[in-house]
Design a protein with these regions (language model features):
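Basic nucleic-acid-binding interfaces
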Residues: 1-25, 30-69
Length: 69
């Protein structure tokens, strides 16, 4: 099984796709583009697979983009 990415790598993919940091509450950061808002738990060494799939769905970015880092 492939190694799951850290929150830093997930955030870098979001930034590459035009998302910008909006706010943080506790350990959750909010990133937003023109249409969508994505919540990322940060900092984490590994993002759990279910959370990663949820981030993929919220952002509209293919799951494979996050795995192939």
């Amino acid at each position: 099984m492939t190694k799951l990415p850290s929150s830093d790598k997930v955030i870098s993919v979001l930034l590459d796709y035009g998302f910008v940091f909006k706010s943080q509450k506790g350990s959750h950061q909010k990133y937003k583009n023109k249409e969508k808002t994505v919540i990322v738990p940060a900092p984490r060494k590994q993002i759990p697979i279910g959370t990663l799939k949820s981030i993929s769905k919220q952002s509209g970015i293919a799951y494979s983009e996050f795995i192939n880092l």
